[in-house]
Amino acid sequence: MIDLEKARSCAYQANYHLIWATKYRRKVLLGSVEVRLEEVLKTIAANHGFLLLAARVHHCDHIHVFVSARPKICIPEMVRVLKCNSAKLLFEEFPEIKLRLWGGHLWSEGYAVRTAGVVTSAKIEEYINRN
């Protein structure tokens, strides 16, 4: 049996793999900035009602984030909160980052998202078609 999280009106397992890049793919996420970003994202997630399961910077210019959230949390809003708040905090703590970027933006506009869970699409289709 799959362990589901429980809310007042539903049971769920909602995990998301999020990926986004720095503006212009600038390689600014290194050293203490990289370490601090991973800490900051964990705090931001906790403060906004979702759980950061993992976060890792790749090639100093983009980050992979794995989060678990209640179904009522909108994915674009979750990404917006993570990107906006992390940029604000990193710019305050590491003003030298701004020298590599212009326009006041740390992150590019877009992001990628994938869902993740224990049950595969094939298993869901099989279950639906069987019953």
Tell what function each PLM region has.
Residues 1-131:
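Basic nucleic-acid-binding interfaces
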